[in-house]
Amino acid sequence: MAPKVFYISDGTAITAEVFGHAVLSQFPLEFESLTIPFVETLAKAENVKRQINDCFITTGERPLVFHSIVKPEIRDIIYSSEGLDYDFLNTFVAPLEQHLGVSASPVLHRTHGKANQGYEARIDAINFAMDNDDGQTMKHMDQADLILLGVSRCGKTPSSLYLSMQFGIKAANYPFTEDDMDNLKLPEALKRNKKKLFGLTIDPVRLHEIRQSRMENSRYSSLKQCRLEVKEVEMMFKRERIPYIDTTNHSVEEIATKILDVTGLERHMF
């Protein structure tokens, strides 16, 4: 039976999930998880406590409980359950209070809510990424923080959206298609913003597999075409001295982190 895991918060539960997933990924096990956000009242906390206790009674095993709860009275109710508690906020807050000589002043939703100064930057960046996805328009390239280039299905769109959502970076992306291969060159709008360009490439066999799932047995998905496009685009990256990375078998989180590392782009918000 898969171990049971609860992610609980009086906010979005994003922090609890991120930390919990990071810890549990170290173990070669499958976990059955339940995320419960916005536990903001004593009544909700008591209900969550009952769920945790019911899980313990049913399985005979104490469920893992990862939580990031600001309100002490809510936190105490969760502490009193039969779960095995991992409290991320208090684990770090108490030692920091001692080191800094300042008492924490917890504010609910400060990390992810509108009170966060980066909220507007995040929304603007997300809108920018969607409006400038896949070369839909070249009008706003001057406003971009970053312009991702590459063949179709190499990871440009998810990387652009992730960078905008997580870091408030205005990321546009532009695809090179099979029609470009005979005379592959940078459009003028990209030449004007050459310092913002960053390339993504991918193993042709992996690209073939991805395209096959979308357009099976087409020229677009053929291994020959995939090899041609990857080769031509990589040659152009080298010719134009555009930095690039290989996205093969990397998660969007890893791709985004590598892009930030290579470019030195400042994260606009955390």
UniProtKB/Swiss-Prot annotation:
InterPro entries: Kinase-pyrophosphorylase (IPR005177), PSRP (IPR026530). It comes from the Bacteria. This is Putative phosphoenolpyruvate synthase regulatory protein. Belongs to the pyruvate, phosphate/water dikinase regulatory protein family. PSRP subfamily. It comes from Shewanella oneidensis (strain ATCC 700550 / JCM 31522 / CIP 106686 / LMG 19005 / NCIMB 14063 / MR-1). Its EC number is 2.7.11.33, 2.7.4.28. Keywords: Kinase, Nucleotide-binding, Serine/threonine-protein kinase, Transferase. Bifunctional serine/threonine kinase and phosphorylase involved in the regulation of the phosphoenolpyruvate synthase (PEPS) by catalyzing its phosphorylation/dephosphorylation. The lineage of its organism: Bacteria, Pseudomonadati, Pseudomonadota, Gammaproteobacteria, Alteromonadales. Pfam families: Kinase-PPPase. It is an enzyme of class 2 (transferase). It catalyses: [pyruvate, water dikinase] + ADP = [pyruvate, water dikinase]-phosphate + AMP + H(+); [pyruvate, water dikinase]-phosphate + phosphate + H(+) = [pyruvate, water dikinase] + diphosphate. GO terms for molecular function: ADP binding; ATP binding; phosphotransferase activity, phosphate group as acceptor; protein serine/threonine kinase activity. The keyword Transferase applies. ADP binds at residues 150-157. The keyword Kinase applies.
